[in-house]
């Protein structure tokens, strides 16, 4: 019996003007996801996916490169304006926003959606180096 070959579908170009940039910036990495207004992903990138490893992954430069590559991929779908939501305490927050603006996307709003507990779970113990 002949095996079926897996054919990859060609990515369909959508024509989306406005979208949302979700920037998740942790102490170890920065992940940038560009979505339409409903939250369906158009493109994404991260510092780790670009080949930055170890402590270089958490730098503002790595976040800037991640935002640039995600923006270029999303602009192929016709993206022009963005609302930015930033989550997390990492170093790449501002760098990623600046990179999105420099790539030619118009940022209409910046929102901080970092989750803050109302005294929920006990945090991990402090590091002693």
Curated annotation (Swiss-Prot):
GO terms for molecular function: rRNA binding; structural constituent of ribosome. Gene3D superfamilies: Ribosomal protein S11. It holds the Pfam family Ribosomal_S11. InterPro entries: Ribosomal_uS11 (IPR001971), Ribosomal_uS11_bac-type (IPR019981), Ribosomal_uS11_CS (IPR018102), Ribosomal_uS11_sf (IPR036967). One of its GO terms (biological process) is translation. Part of the 30S ribosomal subunit. Interacts with proteins S7 and S18. Binds to IF-3. This is Small ribosomal subunit protein uS11. The lineage of its organism: Bacteria, Bacillati, Bacillota, Bacilli, Bacillales. The gene is rpsK.
């Amino acid at each position: 019996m002949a095996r079926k070959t897996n054919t990859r579908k060609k990515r369909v170009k959508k024509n989306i003007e406005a979208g949302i940039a979700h920037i998740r910036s942790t102490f170890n990495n920065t992940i940038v996801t560009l979505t339409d207004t409903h939250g369906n992903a158009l493109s994404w990138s991260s510092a780790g996916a670009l080949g930055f490893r170890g402590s270089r992954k958490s730098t503002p430069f790595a976040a800037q490169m991640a935002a640039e590559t995600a923006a270029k991929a999303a602009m192929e779908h016709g993206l022009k304006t963005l609302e930015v939501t930033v989550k997390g305490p990492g170093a790449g927050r501002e760098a990623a926003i600046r990179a999105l603006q420099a790539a030619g996307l118009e940022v209409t709003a910046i929102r901080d959606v970092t989750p803050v507990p109302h005294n929920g779970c006990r945090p991990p113990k402090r590091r002693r180096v």
